[in-house]
Amino acid sequence: MSAGLPIRTATVTRNTNETQIVCSISLDHTPGVDQQIIDIQTGIGFLNHMLHAMAKHGNMSLTLHCKGDLEIDDHHTAEDCALALGEAFKLALGERRGIRRYGTGFAPLDEALSRAVLDISSRPYFCGDLPFTREKIGDLSTEMIPHVFESFATAAGVTLHVDCIRGVNNHHIAEASFKALALAIREAITRTGGNDVPSTKGVLL
Protein backbone atom coordinates (compact mmCIF):
# COMPACT_ATOMS: atom_id res chain seq x y z
CA MET A 1 0.00 0.00 0.00
CA SER A 2 1.27 3.49 -0.86
CA ALA A 3 2.01 5.67 2.15
CA GLY A 4 -0.78 8.08 3.04
CA LEU A 5 -3.31 6.56 0.67
CA PRO A 6 -6.51 4.97 1.99
CA ILE A 7 -6.89 1.20 1.96
CA ARG A 8 -9.33 0.18 -0.74
CA THR A 9 -11.80 -2.06 1.00
CA ALA A 10 -15.51 -2.90 0.90
CA THR A 11 -18.08 -5.29 2.30
CA VAL A 12 -21.16 -6.44 0.40
CA THR A 13 -24.16 -8.37 1.68
CA ARG A 14 -26.31 -10.12 -0.90
CA ASN A 15 -29.47 -11.92 0.19
CA THR A 16 -31.95 -13.63 -2.11
CA ASN A 17 -34.26 -16.61 -1.86
CA GLU A 18 -31.42 -18.66 -3.36
CA THR A 19 -28.29 -17.45 -1.56
CA GLN A 20 -27.17 -15.47 1.46
CA ILE A 21 -23.70 -13.98 0.98
CA VAL A 22 -21.31 -11.70 2.84
CA CYS A 23 -18.19 -10.67 0.94
CA SER A 24 -15.38 -8.45 2.26
CA ILE A 25 -12.37 -7.47 0.16
CA SER A 26 -9.23 -5.41 0.65
CA LEU A 27 -7.20 -4.64 -2.46
CA ASP A 28 -4.09 -3.32 -0.75
CA HIS A 29 -2.39 -6.17 1.09
CA THR A 30 1.37 -5.66 1.24
CA PRO A 31 3.38 -8.87 1.83
CA GLY A 32 5.61 -8.58 4.88
CA VAL A 33 3.79 -5.49 6.13
CA ASP A 34 0.23 -6.56 6.91
CA GLN A 35 -1.54 -9.88 7.24
CA GLN A 36 -3.36 -11.29 4.24
CA ILE A 37 -6.68 -12.79 5.33
CA ILE A 38 -8.41 -15.26 3.04
CA ASP A 39 -11.51 -17.14 4.21
CA ILE A 40 -13.68 -18.62 1.47
CA GLN A 41 -16.72 -20.71 2.39
CA THR A 42 -19.07 -21.09 -0.56
CA GLY A 43 -20.18 -24.66 0.07
CA ILE A 44 -18.49 -25.66 -3.21
CA GLY A 45 -15.02 -27.00 -2.50
CA PHE A 46 -13.47 -26.40 -5.91
CA LEU A 47 -14.89 -22.87 -6.09
CA ASN A 48 -13.35 -22.19 -2.68
CA HIS A 49 -10.01 -23.39 -4.06
CA MET A 50 -10.22 -21.15 -7.14
CA LEU A 51 -11.25 -18.00 -5.26
CA HIS A 52 -8.56 -18.63 -2.66
CA ALA A 53 -5.95 -18.86 -5.43
CA MET A 54 -7.28 -15.68 -7.03
CA ALA A 55 -7.08 -13.74 -3.77
CA LYS A 56 -3.68 -15.12 -2.84
CA HIS A 57 -1.99 -14.29 -6.12
CA GLY A 58 -3.88 -11.02 -6.47
CA ASN A 59 -2.42 -9.86 -3.12
CA MET A 60 -5.95 -9.31 -1.84
CA SER A 61 -7.55 -10.10 1.47
CA LEU A 62 -10.88 -11.77 0.82
CA THR A 63 -13.59 -13.16 3.07
CA LEU A 64 -16.59 -14.69 1.32
CA HIS A 65 -19.23 -16.74 3.10
CA CYS A 66 -22.23 -18.13 1.25
CA LYS A 67 -25.19 -20.27 2.20
CA GLY A 68 -26.81 -21.38 -1.03
CA ASP A 69 -29.40 -23.78 -2.39
CA LEU A 70 -26.88 -26.47 -3.27
CA GLU A 71 -29.60 -29.09 -2.91
CA ILE A 72 -30.71 -27.85 -6.34
CA ASP A 73 -27.31 -27.48 -8.02
CA ASP A 74 -24.25 -25.23 -8.02
CA HIS A 75 -25.53 -22.55 -10.41
CA HIS A 76 -27.06 -20.01 -8.03
CA THR A 77 -24.23 -20.26 -5.51
CA ALA A 78 -21.40 -19.93 -8.03
CA GLU A 79 -23.09 -17.11 -9.93
CA ASP A 80 -24.10 -15.11 -6.86
CA CYS A 81 -20.68 -15.47 -5.22
CA ALA A 82 -19.11 -14.02 -8.37
CA LEU A 83 -21.65 -11.20 -8.47
CA ALA A 84 -20.99 -10.33 -4.82
CA LEU A 85 -17.24 -10.47 -5.40
CA GLY A 86 -17.51 -8.20 -8.43
CA GLU A 87 -19.69 -5.72 -6.56
CA ALA A 88 -17.28 -5.64 -3.62
CA PHE A 89 -14.34 -5.17 -6.00
CA LYS A 90 -16.08 -2.23 -7.69
CA LEU A 91 -16.94 -0.58 -4.37
CA ALA A 92 -13.44 -1.09 -2.96
CA LEU A 93 -11.85 0.41 -6.05
CA GLY A 94 -13.98 3.53 -5.72
CA GLU A 95 -13.50 6.38 -8.17
CA ARG A 96 -11.30 5.08 -10.95
CA ARG A 97 -8.47 7.55 -10.61
CA GLY A 98 -4.74 7.07 -10.34
CA ILE A 99 -4.69 3.43 -11.42
CA ARG A 100 -3.13 1.68 -14.39
CA ARG A 101 -6.59 0.54 -15.56
CA TYR A 102 -5.26 -2.22 -17.84
CA GLY A 103 -3.80 -5.50 -16.64
CA THR A 104 -2.50 -8.65 -18.28
CA GLY A 105 -1.63 -11.90 -16.56
CA PHE A 106 -0.14 -15.17 -17.78
CA ALA A 107 -0.13 -18.15 -15.43
CA PRO A 108 1.14 -21.69 -16.06
CA LEU A 109 0.27 -24.81 -14.13
CA ASP A 110 2.27 -27.71 -15.49
CA GLU A 111 1.03 -28.25 -19.07
CA ALA A 112 -1.69 -25.58 -18.84
CA LEU A 113 -1.07 -21.93 -19.71
CA SER A 114 -3.78 -19.30 -19.35
CA ARG A 115 -3.96 -15.61 -20.15
CA ALA A 116 -6.23 -12.95 -18.66
CA VAL A 117 -6.57 -9.40 -19.96
CA LEU A 118 -8.51 -6.86 -17.89
CA ASP A 119 -9.73 -3.32 -18.53
CA ILE A 120 -11.25 -1.46 -15.58
CA SER A 121 -13.41 0.44 -18.01
CA SER A 122 -16.99 0.52 -16.69
CA ARG A 123 -17.78 -1.51 -19.81
CA PRO A 124 -18.85 -4.92 -18.48
CA TYR A 125 -18.00 -7.68 -20.91
CA PHE A 126 -16.52 -11.16 -20.79
CA CYS A 127 -15.08 -13.35 -23.51
CA GLY A 128 -13.19 -16.57 -22.93
CA ASP A 129 -11.98 -19.84 -24.36
CA LEU A 130 -11.63 -22.57 -21.74
CA PRO A 131 -11.51 -26.03 -23.35
CA PHE A 132 -12.90 -28.18 -20.56
CA THR A 133 -13.57 -31.82 -21.37
CA ARG A 134 -15.19 -32.88 -18.09
CA GLU A 135 -18.66 -32.06 -16.80
CA LYS A 136 -17.38 -31.33 -13.29
CA ILE A 137 -14.19 -30.64 -11.39
CA GLY A 138 -14.88 -31.77 -7.86
CA ASP A 139 -18.31 -30.37 -7.05
CA LEU A 140 -18.21 -27.44 -9.50
CA SER A 141 -19.72 -27.76 -12.97
CA THR A 142 -17.14 -26.74 -15.57
CA GLU A 143 -19.81 -24.77 -17.44
CA MET A 144 -20.00 -22.50 -14.39
CA ILE A 145 -16.35 -21.46 -14.56
CA PRO A 146 -16.72 -19.10 -17.54
CA HIS A 147 -20.03 -17.99 -16.03
CA VAL A 148 -18.20 -17.07 -12.81
CA PHE A 149 -15.82 -14.90 -14.83
CA GLU A 150 -18.74 -13.35 -16.71
CA SER A 151 -20.68 -12.62 -13.52
CA PHE A 152 -17.62 -11.06 -11.89
CA ALA A 153 -16.99 -8.85 -14.94
CA THR A 154 -20.62 -7.75 -15.06
CA ALA A 155 -20.81 -6.76 -11.40
CA ALA A 156 -17.32 -5.22 -11.32
CA GLY A 157 -17.90 -3.19 -14.47
CA VAL A 158 -14.80 -4.47 -16.24
CA THR A 159 -13.93 -5.92 -19.62
CA LEU A 160 -12.35 -9.33 -19.14
CA HIS A 161 -10.86 -11.86 -21.53
CA VAL A 162 -9.69 -15.22 -20.15
CA ASP A 163 -8.24 -17.82 -22.49
CA CYS A 164 -6.44 -21.10 -21.98
CA ILE A 165 -3.64 -21.05 -24.54
CA ARG A 166 -2.93 -24.72 -24.02
CA GLY A 167 -3.86 -27.35 -21.47
CA VAL A 168 -5.04 -30.91 -20.98
CA ASN A 169 -5.85 -31.38 -17.29
CA ASN A 170 -9.14 -29.66 -16.47
CA HIS A 171 -8.10 -28.75 -12.93
CA HIS A 172 -4.92 -27.15 -14.28
CA ILE A 173 -6.83 -25.21 -16.95
CA ALA A 174 -9.19 -23.76 -14.34
CA GLU A 175 -6.55 -22.93 -11.77
CA ALA A 176 -4.19 -21.34 -14.29
CA SER A 177 -7.10 -19.19 -15.48
CA PHE A 178 -7.99 -17.90 -12.00
CA LYS A 179 -4.32 -17.22 -11.27
CA ALA A 180 -3.95 -15.35 -14.56
CA LEU A 181 -6.93 -13.20 -13.57
CA ALA A 182 -5.30 -12.53 -10.20
CA LEU A 183 -2.15 -11.25 -11.89
CA ALA A 184 -4.16 -9.10 -14.30
CA ILE A 185 -6.07 -7.56 -11.38
CA ARG A 186 -2.84 -6.81 -9.51
CA GLU A 187 -1.49 -4.92 -12.50
CA ALA A 188 -4.70 -3.05 -13.36
CA ILE A 189 -5.37 -1.74 -9.83
CA THR A 190 -1.77 -0.63 -9.24
CA ARG A 191 -1.69 2.99 -8.17
CA THR A 192 0.26 5.27 -10.50
CA GLY A 193 0.97 8.01 -7.97
CA GLY A 194 -1.23 10.46 -9.83
CA ASN A 195 -4.89 11.39 -9.59
CA ASP A 196 -5.89 11.35 -13.23
CA VAL A 197 -8.70 9.33 -14.75
CA PRO A 198 -7.03 6.91 -17.19
CA SER A 199 -9.38 7.69 -20.08
CA THR A 200 -9.49 10.20 -22.93
CA LYS A 201 -13.13 10.78 -21.95
CA GLY A 202 -12.04 12.11 -18.57
CA VAL A 203 -14.46 9.79 -16.78
CA LEU A 204 -14.89 6.07 -16.17
CA LEU A 205 -18.45 5.81 -14.95
From Swiss-Prot:
GO terms for molecular function: imidazoleglycerol-phosphate dehydratase activity. One of its GO terms (biological process) is L-histidine biosynthetic process. This is Imidazoleglycerol-phosphate dehydratase. It catalyses: D-erythro-1-(imidazol-4-yl)glycerol 3-phosphate = 3-(imidazol-4-yl)-2-oxopropyl phosphate + H2O. InterPro entries: IGPD_sf, ImidazoleglycerolP_deHydtase, ImidazoleglycerP_deHydtase_CS, Ribosomal_Su5_D2-typ_SF. CDD domains: IGPD. Pfam families: IGPD. Belongs to the imidazoleglycerol-phosphate dehydratase family. Keywords: Amino-acid biosynthesis, Histidine biosynthesis, Lyase. Pathway: Amino-acid biosynthesis; L-histidine biosynthesis; L-histidine from 5-phospho-alpha-D-ribose 1-diphosphate: step 6/9. Its EC number is 4.2.1.19. The lineage of its organism: Eukaryota, Fungi, Dikarya, Basidiomycota, Agaricomycotina. Disulfide bonds: none annotated. It is an enzyme of class 4 (lyase). Gene3D superfamilies: Imidazole glycerol phosphate dehydratase, domain 1. Signal peptide: none annotated.
